[in-house]
Amino acid sequence: MSVSLTDKLVVAISSRALFDFEEENRVFEAGDLGAYEQLQRERLNVPARPGVAFGLMRKLLALNTGAHHVEVVILSRSDPISGLRAFSSCREHGLNIQRGVFTRGRTPWHYLKPLNASLFLSANPDDVRAALEAGFPAARVFPRVFPRPDANSATMSAASADRNANEIRIAFDGDAVLFSDEAEQIFQQQGLGAFVSHERDNRDLPLAHGPLQPLLAALHRLQKLADGNAQNMRIRTALVTARSAPAHERAIRTLMAWNIEIDEAMFLGGLEKGPFLREFEPDFFFDDQIRHCESARSVTATGHVALGAANAAPGLATASHTTADTRAP
């Protein structure tokens, strides 16, 4: 019987998002592929430390108790020999990851289709943008900012796992992440007043799917399975958005139309998201705006969804910060 991943939540993740390969990556990005490969060979038997998204992957794989619901695949620009170190690091850390694709410097996102991936996490912004523009759910993993000099991704992943050992917590921005950027375009082109009027007038019309809607839908299915099967690991989701009333109504009605339930919704009206994320304690947070990612990355692992009106041109997301604090996404 042929093997298929069609009924699984498939997460494709780069080796640098999964493990701390920052030192090796500096050699790679310097353009000396031979020196990079030699460095990886020298460290072949040295397990890499956990990276930014390690904690989330470990918890997602814990959902496979009793049945195989989640597949994590390493999808990397590294060469196949460097892939040996990635797999041995998985084994050392107890991650049951069995599949990987290594492209030796070529962009790897084309393999998302045969993998049927519900999410692609990478530290490479070009790969993420290419995947998003091709219609695949993807996010650029932001480097963590640590509150203490002695902290790193490994210690922070461990601390997060210990805090909520039996619960996967994932937080999403709304517009241009879960939802399309339709409302964001109104704001960018016509201003806050037009945005509020547009959302109030269209409150009964569901928004179109955003790039990470497939991930939320897959998590919702797993959430129902976990609740029904008395799984030890639970899933809890949150919508963390700069929308406020009356624009909140269309967001909730859209989720209702999709038959997707979320556990928490925060309509912040431009307040900084970081303090609210600190209370929710997510394992991962997704947002389309650099500003919100910067606010969040000292609190949690963060992914930038570089698509939509806020990312339409270089510098646009940053340039709009002073005016975007009271609007939709």
Feature names for model-found ranges:
Residues M1-V11, D127-I170, G174-L178, E182-D201, ...:
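Asp-based, Mg2+/Mn2+-dependent phosphohydrolase catalytic module
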Residues D20, R26-E29, Q40-R41, N45, ...:
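A cross-kingdom feature marking solvent-exposed beta-strand/loop segments within repeated
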Residues S2-R106, D173-F267:
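Alpha-helical substrate-recognition element adjacent to the catalytic core
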